[in-house]
Amino acid sequence: TPDHREVPSFSSRWEPNFGLTFSK
């Protein structure tokens, strides 16, 4: 289940980045 493991890790790492980018 490589997809399941990469999904949360990728989302968690991009979620904060996206929020900061959207705010800026």
From Swiss-Prot:
Compartments it resides in: Secreted
Gene Ontology CC: extracellular region
Taxonomy, superkingdom: Eukaryota
Gene Ontology BP, a term: defense response to bacterium
Location (main, coarse): secreted
Entry keywords, A to Z: Antibiotic, Antimicrobial, Secreted
Keyword Nucleotide-binding listed: no
Role, per record: Hemolymph antibacterial protein.
Protein name: Attacin
Species of provenance: Heliothis virescens
